[in-house]
């Protein structure tokens, strides 16, 4: 079988992986050995195939072994900054939830700088987080035991005697939810420990009282992370796959729906058919015609019509609103957020976007001009009016048990105003002075984009 990783950032530097879904892999779902400054966030790694015939392990041990591993993670190596792993969901994986791969620097000293926070881990088997790194922040994570879980330690920092220097960790704010639903907070010897091997002598302090480095993302409590990660994780735009929705619901409710055919372990499939196989996935194939993006700049025509840019002229590297993000980046950010293209009133079932909240109370946290919004029994009704902009953002807040989450909902309204005005070409030379984008006065303009009195004007 194919024993490659599902996805990875091995050796990467200054890189981010965001909102990905990885499942049914052999070896492990994700690997970033040797990575430097990088981030993995809002990604779901689930159902790594367990007793699946991992070729290398068979060659080394002469037998098939359980190898349903989530991730081996590097970061902050070779003088770089830090590897950041936050707001991810790891579910139904036997081991490596996570496996720390700090490595050694060029002089043989322990390397690696890891910041692991606000992750949710459910139904691991015999291994949660283990391995070694020079400096580790392990904080505000939520580990929920499942029917396959046999390892109680959330963190085993392993000092293996292969290098020089120290390996230490800051541990704080983590929760282990027991199989009976009770919660256990950080306690050395109960939820975390260190291990010595290969003659390693511990002549340093293995635990730090404070984080080694700043976390460059908002750090929530473990309780908040549990609800908020389950509400927004994985490849969930434009729609969430039924597989991912199932895994989220099982994590929320503490259930499983699969059994490994060889191991008999609940929730840990040995092959994809244990989980229904590829035929069970609700994947719909679609194709686009050539008119979807006429100028081939990566921005579809429908979005260019909404923003008032010219779909016949590539503008992917332009910055129409002067915010230092290109027009292409603006489009990608818009479609990466829940979005709706409408011409009339519509409704949204908020349960689909706040899956981590069982009994949430909802409120409108921000409503743009020209849009009316109301919520009843978890159903959001949105009504655009003629004064609405072509692009606007509505904000909805969910609250439950002292925890809250605010999510954006982008609304495209073709009947609204883009703020860019079309004027007939024949009338252009009779009005106020017109300037091109190099701020040169134009008296006989050709079709294109111009400036008049500080506003953009399109002449067609």
Model-derived features with residue positions:
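C-terminal edge beta-strand
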Residues: 402-416
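Extracellular calcium-associated, cysteine-rich motifs in secreted modular proteins
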Residues: 275-342
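Extracellular beta-rich repeat passengers
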Residues: 99-104, 109-275
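Surface-exposed or secretory-pathway low-complexity segments enriched in glycine-proline
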Residues: 344-348, 352-379, 407-410
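Right-handed parallel beta-helix
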Residues: 1, 11-24, 36-100, 110-125, ...
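Residue-level detector of functionally pivotal "anchor" positions at catalytic/ligand-binding pockets or at interdomain
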Residues: 338-342, 414-438
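Extracellular/luminal low-complexity segments enriched in Ser/Thr/Pro
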Residues: 379-393
């Amino acid at each position: 079988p194919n024993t490659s990783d599902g996805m990875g950032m091995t050796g990467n530097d200054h890189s981010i992986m965001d909102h990905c879904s990885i499942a049914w892999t052999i070896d492990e779902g994700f690997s970033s050995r040797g990575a430097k400054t990088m981030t993995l966030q809002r990604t779901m790694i689930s159902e790594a195939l367990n007793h699946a015939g991992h070729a290398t392990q068979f060659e080394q041990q002469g037998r098939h072994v359980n190898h349903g591993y989530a991730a081996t993670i590097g970061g902050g190596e070779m003088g770089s900054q830090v590897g950041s792993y936050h707001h991810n969901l790891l579910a139904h994986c036997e081991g490596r939830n996570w496996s720390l791969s700090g490595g050694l620097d060029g002089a043989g000293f322990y390397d690696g700088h890891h910041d692991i926070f606000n992750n949710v881990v459910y139904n691991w088997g015999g291994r949660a987080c283990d391995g070694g790194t020079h400096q580790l922040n392990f904080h505000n994570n939520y580990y929920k035991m499942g029917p396959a879980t046999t390892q109680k330690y959330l963190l085993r920092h392993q000092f293996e005697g292969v290098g020089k220097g120290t390996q230490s960790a800051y541990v704080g704010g983590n929760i282990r939810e027991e199989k009976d639903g009770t919660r256990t907070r950080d306690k050395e010897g109960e939820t975390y420990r260190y291990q010595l091997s290969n003659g390693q002598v511990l002549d340093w302090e293995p635990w730090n009282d404070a984080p080694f480095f700043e976390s460059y993302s908002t750090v929530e409590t473990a309780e908040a992370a549990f609800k908020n990660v389950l509400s927004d994780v994985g490849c969930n735009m434009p729609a969430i796959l039924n597989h991912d929705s199932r895994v989220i619901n099982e994590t929320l409710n503490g259930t499983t729906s699969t059994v490994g055919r060889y191991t008999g372990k609940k929730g840990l499939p040995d092959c994809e058919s244990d989980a229904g196989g590829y035929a069970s996935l609700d994947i719909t194939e679609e194709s686009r015609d050539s008119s979807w993006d006429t100028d081939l700049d990566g921005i579809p025509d429908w979005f260019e019509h909404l923003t008032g840019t010219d779909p016949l002229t590539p503008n992917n590297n332009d910055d129409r609103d002067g915010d230092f993000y290109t027009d292409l980046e603006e489009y990608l950010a818009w479609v990466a957020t829940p979005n709706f293209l409408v011409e009339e009133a519509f409704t949204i079932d908020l349960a689909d976007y706040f899956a981590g909240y069982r009994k949430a109370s909802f409120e409108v946290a921000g409503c743009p001009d020209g849009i009316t919004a109301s919520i009843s029994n978890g159903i959001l009704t949105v009504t655009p009016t003629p004064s609405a902009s072509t692009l606007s953002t509505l904000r909805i807040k969910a609250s439950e048990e002292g925890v809250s989450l605010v999510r954006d909902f982008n609304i495209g309204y073709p009947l609204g105003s883009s703020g860019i005005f079309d004027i007939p070409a024949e009338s252009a030379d009779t009005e106020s002075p017109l300037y091109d984008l190099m701020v040169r006065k134009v008296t006989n303009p050709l079709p294109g984009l111009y400036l008049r009195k500080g506003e953009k004007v399109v002449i067609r």
